[in-house]
From Swiss-Prot:
NAD(+) binds at G11, A12, A13, G14, Q15, I16, G17, N105, Q112, V129, G130, N131. Belongs to the LDH/MDH superfamily. MDH type 2 family. It comes from the Bacteria. It comes from Leptospira borgpetersenii serovar Hardjo-bovis (strain JB197). The active site is at H187 (proton acceptor). Signal peptide: none annotated. One of its GO terms (biological process) is tricarboxylic acid cycle. Catalyzes the reversible oxidation of malate to oxaloacetate. Keywords: NAD, Oxidoreductase, Tricarboxylic acid cycle. This is Malate dehydrogenase. Substrate binds at R92, R98, N131, R162. It catalyses: (S)-malate + NAD(+) = oxaloacetate + NADH + H(+). Its EC number is 1.1.1.37. One of its GO terms (molecular function) is L-malate dehydrogenase (NAD+) activity.
Amino acid sequence: MGKTVKVAVTGAAGQIGYSLLFRIASGQMFGTDTAVEIQMLELEAAIPAAKGVIMELEDCAFPLLQKVTVSSDLDIAFKDINWALLVGSVPRKAGMERGDLLKINGGIFINQGKAIEKNAASDVRVLVVGNPCNTNCLIAMNNAKGIPSDRWFAMTKLDENRAKSQLASKAGVPVKEVTHLGIWGNHSSTQYPDFYNAKISGKPVTDVISDHEWLKGDFIKNVQQRGAEIIKARGASSAASAANGVVDTVRAIITPTASGDAFSAAIASDGSYGTEKGLIFGFPLKSDGKKVGIVQGLPFNDFAKEKFKTTHDELISERNEVKDML
């Protein structure tokens, strides 16, 4: 067996946490030769529920799970961790705008950023899942300036998976045939799922799917609004699919990307594609297993440029609303 990875999961007793923890403990995130220690962070009121989840984890007798703890103390939960999965945030309810959440969540992510910088291992990497995840990530990162900016990620993999599923269904092919599907910008209803640069069975999507009006209309709208649709149908936000997105993101970061493919996550922009430097912006990415880089040189037509600008403008606006927290 290889090394042991220490993982902090915030909001661990919540619905996403509940779906996620068992997949981490079973080896689906870090692989079957890597032992894991899970350090759960929860609000004091949720500690009893978290202890129930710990009992269930113990009862699974996962060979890779070395230890699992829960605390409401940031310093304890983030001690010596290699990965921080920041799942917990004040949840979005039906009818609530994302803007309402910015200030509410800002204080949470200021404190978490500071505590991660103070307590985590020197190689720590952070994935923010709790919404609004791009700006929550921006706040945490700017309050942990001792941690290199290339260690911070916000999740857009769920959007990528949603988009792949829609394209596969429309084309009548298995979802694995859809590759190089980038999500640009914000994990919000302005995100741009880039079908122009994606492939189905190695061919451009626009060659395989002849209904270009669907691609430019319902496809994008379906991906952008999917989270809201699930809240409407289920009475609660995406949980198992979000947890799956977390597993997929971490695996994509730590595993070399297949030739000709890419994966989606939001990272601190280096100015690529004219984005404002330092914004947490969604890009198509490649990994060599250690370092992650932005896929360069992708073409944009006028339609794509307009979609790109809309999501970029929204992220600038979100950043401006939380400037005093950065």
